Amino acid sequence: MIPSQTNLGNVIGIMSPFQFLVGASLILGLLRADSVTLPLWPAGAVPGSRGTNDADIPTLTTYPAARTSQAQPAMVILPGGGYGGLAGHEGRDYALFLNREGVHGFVVKYRLGSQGYRHPSMLQDAARAVRWVRAHAAEWGVDPDRIGIMGSSAGGHLASTLLTHHDGGDAQSSDRVERMSSRPNLGVLCYAVISMGPFSHAGSRRNLLGENPSAELIEDLSNENRVTTTTPPVFIWSLRDDGAVPIENSMAFATACRQHKVPFELHLYDGKPHGIGLGAKPPTFENPHVWTADLLAWLKIQRWR
């Protein structure tokens, strides 16, 4: 709350344009209890940036759930789109659906291969988003030990990359966000691309790695190869006859989790349309696909509900 004696003109006068934009967005968001979009990095600090256009500025859009007296879980959401676009129904719709269950949603606009970016730019954006939510947990009513990552299709590949390539943060950084761990506390992988090998999605691989990636890069970003005992618990689902992203991707990640004793659930459903999302639209979300009920049951087991 701003004290009644504060002179806003003086406050604004000592702010940089970037600080004013972020501060105004935060204040308006808190007053409206609505979504706001914030840059993930301060102006000029995006690693590997190719410019200052909208496509060069990764952002986080907040979808706060109704607040309670206790800190609540949060889901960082990575929409799919083959690393060439971002599917709104796999971002905002997921966040609004989870809001009804008391889970805060944070949707990431990450950099894309269609705009000239390649790995590791996308991973940097996803990791920064988890760090940002953890660093700002108290301000948003988030439990810093219940921050998940959720992704669909190529967004699922990015989520699985963070699940297997996270770090503990840089304790020496002057940026408090960078001091935070990027490890999610759990993951949700929806018809996810997992492998960069034979059963990968060709467009996602090309947009992420370019035309002629090295064998080492293909191995490293085939995330079934990178599961360890430190990989967080994960909920995995696919449609049996998905023609774009074969179920072998989900099965490979589940098999790796089993081998390394990582808690997981794997659900394979009848059907074939790729990219179905919830199978229902806001605001009512009538008759969603059964995977949503299975996810909510699993989240309850994880003590997220």
Task: For each feature predicted by the language model, list its residue ranges.
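Mobile cap/lid helix-loop segments that gate and shape the active-site cleft of serine hydrolases
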Residues: 43, 176, 192-226, 232
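Primarily recognizes the serine-hydrolase "nucleophile elbow" in alpha/beta-hydrolase
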Residues: 128-202, 218-219
